Amino acid sequence: QVEDDVVDALASSVKDAYPDLSHRYYKLKAKWFGQEQLEYWDRNAPLPDDSDKRYSWDEARSMVLEAYGAFEPQMSDIAQRFFDERWIDAGPRPGKDSGAFSHPTVPSAHPYILMNFHGKSRDVMTLAHELGHGVHQILSGPQGALMSDTPLTTAETASVFGEMLTFRAMLEGETDPARRKILLAGKVEDMLKSVVRQIAFHHFETKVHDERKV
């Protein structure tokens, strides 16, 4: 569990940073769209010159493993097992659930990853994110069934770390300025949705509960 004071401090810090985070970015995006103010429904619209480069599954695998290995070879070695032993269900097909997750099962077995890979840069990030969970789950397995499970705050730290390792490697390997702008914009929007939007939800729900108490 996360203490209430910690949650309140986090929420306040993010809210105080709204002008420097979401407000600043959306003003910039409005300029890219030739608008004075960005419309609400255009917040997540692709940039005008976004052709969304496609990656093969093998390219995505190599990018993630190389990014992991550059940080720590053991991290890459563990992630490699997910490919070699077919612990990843990535192919889209009719009737398959959407979304993505890494299920830890039990420590005596191994995790399974579900995702839908369409070759977009965001799919590469999803693969890196879920493998971050998977590596974490493998490493926590020796703690046993009662101690290996982790709260979301800890689990998401591992997954976002793996995702950011891969993103930085992808960005450093991209030489086209327009493509670099698209990658950075996509990552900023992902982080706004993961952090700023969630805090906005939190503030709304807190107000609803406070009003209900009155």
For the regions a protein language model found, what residue spans apply to each?
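Cation-handling catalytic/transport regions enriched in His/Asp/Glu
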Residues: 1-214
